[in-house]
Amino acid sequence: MNKPTLGIDLDTTLNTLDREWVKRYNEIYKDKLLPSDIKGWDIENYVKPECGKKIYDILKEPHFFRNLGVQPFAETALEELTSIFNIYIVSATHYKVCEDKGNWIKEKFPFISYQNIIFCHNKGLVHLDILIDDNPLNLENFKGNKILFDAHHNKSENRFVRARDWYEAKALCESLKDFL
């Protein structure tokens, strides 16, 4: 019997993008922004006016993604979930950072095959049984079971089942497996 499929977003769900992005912004613009200050998806609304949309240029810096940390318990959770699910890393990303992101996954999650990494723009086109993502927009178009991974920018979102951390995300996936 085929195992059910589990898609997992990369940025802020598996890695610590939110923290490192804000840290890098603070270094450049001499600010004291905290990840907890960001209450919505459009980060340019929370930075200094002279930064604005230039905040997204940080994401294109060479090797920025290679230096991100891993969310607590994510490595263990994914490794344990591989016995139940075929796991895919699904990232909506700019083409210039695919190599860095792929290398980060290879380094941090060596048990995930490169064949199980999907770079796309519209996650609604990816057919999986479950998707874990911190971006509600990605979950809106997804047809399978949806789990919103908790982040400062999605605190006001209440349309989806929420996992506050990887302990909860793992437990939710395990509880869904019998219904797939």
UniProtKB/Swiss-Prot annotation:
It comes from the Bacteria. Its cofactor is Mg(2+). Gene3D superfamilies: Deoxyribonucleotidase, domain 2, HAD superfamily/HAD-like. It is an enzyme of class 3 (hydrolase). Its EC number is 3.1.3.-. GO terms for molecular function: 5'-nucleotidase activity; metal ion binding. GO terms for biological process: pyrimidine deoxyribonucleotide catabolic process. Keywords: Hydrolase, Magnesium, Metal-binding. The keyword Magnesium applies. Mg(2+) binds at D9, D11, D134. Pfam families: NT5C (PF06941). The active site is at D9, D11. Dephosphorylates nucleoside monophosphates such as the 5' and 2'(3')-phosphates of deoxyribonucleotides in vitro. Belongs to the 5'(3')-deoxyribonucleotidase family. This is 5'(3')-deoxyribonucleotidase. It comes from Clostridium acetobutylicum (strain ATCC 824 / DSM 792 / JCM 1419 / IAM 19013 / LMG 5710 / NBRC 13948 / NRRL B-527 / VKM B-1787 / 2291 / W).
